[in-house]
Regions:
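Flexible, solvent-exposed coil segments and beta strand-coil junctions
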Residues: 16-20, 176, 207-213
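Hydrophobic alpha-helical scaffolding
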Residues: 3-7, 24, 28, 44, ...
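Solenoid-like repeat scaffolds
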Residues: 21-25, 183-184, 212-220, 248-252
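Active-site acid/base region of carbohydrate-active enzymes
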Residues: 4-15, 29-32, 44-129, 147-193, ...
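Well-ordered alpha-helical scaffold segments within catalytic/enzyme domains
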Residues: 1-7, 34-50, 132-150, 194-204, ...
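Generic helix N-cap/helix-start motif at coil->alpha-helix transitions
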Residues: 187-192, 220-226
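Non-catalytic C-terminal accessory modules of carbohydrate-active enzymes
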Residues: 158, 165, 240-377
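Short beta-alpha connecting loops at secondary-structure transitions
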Residues: 85-88, 96-123, 177-182, 210-217, ...
Length: 377
């Protein structure tokens, strides 16, 4: 995703998605992410050929074959057969849930660490896995709709709604304002609430409490998990909290990677959490897309940036500027905070496009045509 936000030529990222479709690795959740990756590729490129070519593969990646009558999935109840593994092109052994990495205790390989999953209890019906399942179904509904398959689009939408209903009735802890780790668990890891919040699964009347719980845990996840933690906070309009985590200087921070002497993002926050960490790892680069997509708020509203959505969430920043690439030309956004807390914005919208701007403080919405614009709140 960071590639799509920082470049206007997406060949490397597209090749990576195609490879992962045919050669998935072992975590359940990463296979479930495939429909989201394919959908985002379509939004950024405007090219639907990947969706058409891999449609049936993407359907299988939702793991609909693992659903029970409640719309919940599990890899640990006997439904994960060789045939199901073959349908998602998994040829190895040991397909299982991950939640976060590295894992600790009996579930993990890294015995030196307690793991980065905030004590998550690995239950048969796993909250995190089912949040991913819900998201995969939502993405498939959008993909089917984009391809004109309205019957499939409705079916996947209804399946997602059923999954959401079960999660919200069975796995919500009203007293703590958070989701439990799975069926039969009383533990609430940060992950069990940040993933449903990031994926839009949390009902409107629970968003504030869920966000407060997630925020109260700090950065209780790995750098991989940080992508979803910060997405969750931005989804809940907690932009100042997200900014503080992104700009943090503790052990779990991008600042710490620099302090260790690395010139490329690393696999883990620090060798304390993973002594054999990679010193060049793509998932460590989440901040690259979070700044563009969330802090500056620039995303494609229509495929190929035919229409651009700009919803800045600057937190307490005084000044920010970005030159965001797109296939139609660069999008420029400069924000300067005024003494009254409101912002002055300078924007450039490329030719053959238009933008929907939501102002950061007043939340007023404006439509911008190609060219330069100066906007005062």
């Amino acid at each position: 995703l960071s590639h799509y936000v920082t470049d206007r030529e997406y060949t490397m990222a597209r090749r990576s998605i195609a490879h992962l479709i045919m050669h998935p690795t072992w975590p359940t959740e990463w296979i479930l992410l495939t429909p989201r990756m394919a959908w985002l590729d379509y939004l950024y490129t405007g090219d639907r050929r990947m969706l058409e070519h891999y449609y049936q593969d993407l359907v299988a990646k939702t793991f609909h074959a693992l659903r029970d009558e409640r719309g919940l999935i599990s890899t640990r109840t006997g439904l994960l057969t060789r045939e199901v593994c073959a349908s998602v092109h998994f040829r190895g052994r040991g397909l299982r849930d991950i939640v976060d990495w590295p894992q600790g205790g009996a579930a993990g390989i890294e015995k030196e660490s307690e793991g980065e999953a905030d004590g998550h209890e690995m239950r048969d019906v796993n909250m995190v896995v089912n949040a991913y399942h819900y998201d995969a179904l939502r993405m498939m509904s959008k993909i089917a709709g984009a391809l004109g398959n309205e019957e499939d689009s409705l079916r996947f939408c209804q399946m997602a709604e059923r999954t959401a209903q079960s999660i919200n009735s069975l796995l919500w802890d009203q007293k703590r304002g958070a989701y439990v780790d799975g069926e039969g668990s009383s533990h609430c890891s940060q992950h069990s609430s940040m993933f449903p919040l990031a994926f839009g699964l949390v009902p409107q009347d629970r968003i504030q409490r869920t966000a407060e719980y997630v925020q109260s845990r700090g950065m209780a996840c790995s750098v991989y998990g940080a992508q979803f933690l910060l997405d969750a906070l931005y989804e809940a309009q907690q932009d100042e909290a997200a900014l503080q985590l992104m700009a943090g200087t503790g052990l779990r921070s991008w600042y710490n990677m620099i302090s260790m002497g690395s010139t490329i993002t690393t696999e883990a926050w620090d060798k304390v959490f993973k002594p054999n960490l990679d010193w060049n790892h793509a998932w460590g680069a989440a901040a690259a897309n979070l700044i563009g997509r969330r802090l500056m708020g620039i995303t494609p509203l229509k495929p190929g940036f035919e229409e651009i959505d700009i919803q800045p969430q600057p937190g307490g920043l005084e000044y920010a500027y970005i030159k965001h690439p797109s296939p139609r030309g660069s999008i420029h956004l400069k924000m300067k905070r005024q003494p009254d807390g409101r912002y002055h914005l300078d924007l450039y919208i490329p030719a053959n496009s238009r933008a929907r701007l939501t102002l950061p403080t007043t939340k007023q919405t404006l439509t911008l045509l190609p060219g330069r614009h100066h906007v005062r709140e």
